[in-house]
Amino acid sequence: EDDYADDPVGNFEQLWKIIDERYCFLEEKGIDWDAVHDKYGKLVKPGISDDDLFDILSQMLYELKDGHVNLSSSSRISYYDAWYQGYPWNYREDILYNYYLGSASSGYRTSAGLKYKIFDNNIGYIRYESFSAGVGDGNLDHVLDYLKLCNGLIIDVRDNGGGNLTNSTRIAARFTNEKTLTGYIQHKTGPGHNDFSEMEPIYLEPSNSIRWQKKVVLLTNRRCYSATNDFVNAMHSLNNDNEEQRIFQVGDQTGGGSGLPFSSELPNGWSVRFSASPHFNKYKKPLENGIEPDVYVNMDKILEEGIEHGDAESQKKDALIERAFEILSE
C-alpha cells in the first residue's frame, strides 16, 4: 500500500483509496467515487482539527449510504442510519407486550435470546431481538419442543439490526430437511471496481435435531439488517418453487446490509469498517437493498387511521401479528 503521512491530507487520501479499491458496491450503487474525492478533498486543509477531519471523512462515507460503513476514533464513531428513515416503523413494543406477550413472569417464556409463547389460537410465536444474542442448539430444541403442537409459527425479527451469522444459520437449519442453496457470495480480487471472484454458492445444511415442518410467518420491518437480512433470505430460499409456499414474510422490505464487512486502518490509528463481499440470493439477485415481503403491511398507517376514526380497539392491535394469524389459520 502507498504510505500516506499521518496528517489530515494523508488520512483523507488513505481512506478514499481503501474505499476505492476494496468497497464492493461502488458500481452497484452507481457512485462516482472520483467526484467524491474532488468534493471532499478540497475541504481537507493541512492543520484542521481531528474533530473537523472526522466530520469531513464521515460525510464522505455517508455518500455510500451503507449501514455497514463506520469510521471509528478513540472518542467517536460515525454511523449511517438513513437506510430505514422514511419507512413505517411497523413495530410498537408497548402493543406487543401489553396485548400479546404479557410479562416475563406470567406471559411469555425466555430461552437464551429467544422469547416465546403459544397464543390462545394455538399459534406459536418466537421473538428474536438481536442476532448478537447467543442461541444454542439446546435452546432451540427446548423452544421447538414446547411449540411442537402449534398449528403454525410466527418468528418476529422486527428491529433486529443483525449480529452473528452463526446464529442466523443455526436457526434457519431448523426449517429444512435437506441441504439447500441459499445464495452466492463474491470476493474482491483486485483494486478495480468490478474485480470480483466468480460467485461461490452458499448452502444451508439441515439440523440433525428437532426441525419445524409446518408453516412459518416472518415479521419484518425496514430496521431488519445484516445478519437478519441473511436469515430472511435463507428462510425464503427454503420455499420450493414447485411446492405450496410454506414460509411467508409479512411487513415491510428488510433493510439490506448484505455485504460482509471488513476493517482497515488509517495512518492516525482510526479504523474504517466497510462492505467488502457482496451476497446474492439463490437467483443471483443482489440482497443489498433488502428483501421484499410476500404480504406488505403498514401498521403505522392502520394505527393512524384507527385514531382518526376514534376506534380504541384498533390501538391494541399489532397489524403484522394479526395478518400472520390469518395466513397461519388458512
Question: Can you say where each PLM-predicted feature lies in the sequence?
Answer:
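Flexible, low-complexity junctional segments that flank or bridge functional domains
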Residues: E1-H187, N194-E198, K215, E243, ...
